[in-house]
Amino acid sequence: KARFVEMFGDPEINSMNLPVKPMTEVCEIIDGDRGKNYPTQEEFSDEGYCLFLNAKNVTSNGFSFENCMFVTKEKDELLRKGHLNRGDVVLTTRGTIGNLAFYDESVPYENVRINSGMVVLRMNHEIVSERFFIEQFKMQIGSIKEKIASGSAQPQLPISTMNKIVVLMPSVKQQQVFTDFVKQVDKSK
């Protein structure tokens, strides 16, 4: 966080006056499948073809795979949306909102799908790095939560709200310097 602010300023107020873009131009926001093929409790198992993420899998510290639920290949193929590609970022949007996890090569599952309380953020790699986006979003989530605190029993972060979130856009080169720094810090942990 300190390194981010040092390099790019405070994303809440854009203290370094960097160019900005709406979140929807920085990444594609992909909703999960909520249709008639959504799995029932009986269709989940402790092992199987496709990891079906639940709220416990996406934490404030990224992925956690202590409690996993799986669906069969057949069930996975019936679902249209919400399948992850390497490099995708998962964002929780219902209940505990704002948790992020990065689906990179370190995740041991090849087939992963989000549940209905999440979205997939597929970055536009020409303009933004995932790690840069994740660190920036973590710094913004507090004020995002304040703005959407609607008093409802279950907090939600709808895509219509995500459309209004702005992302700092330093050069890709600067983002890469930051990303390399984060990778080094992660290695030393």
What are these regions (language model features)?
Residues K1-G35, K164, L168-T179, K183-K189:
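Non-catalytic DNA-recognition/assembly elements of restriction-modification systems
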Residues P19-N61, K75-L79, S150:
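Low-complexity, Lys/Gly-biased intrinsically disordered segments
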Residues S45, E110-V119, S150-Q176:
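A short glycine-rich beta-alpha junction/loop motif
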Residues Y49, N67, N115-G117:
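A generic structural signal for short beta-strands and their flanking turns/coil linkers
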Residues N54, E74-K138, P158:
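A short beta-sheet element
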Residues N57-F70, N111-V112:
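Short, basic/aromatic beta-hairpin or loop at an interaction surface
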Residues G142-K145:
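Periplasmic-binding protein-like
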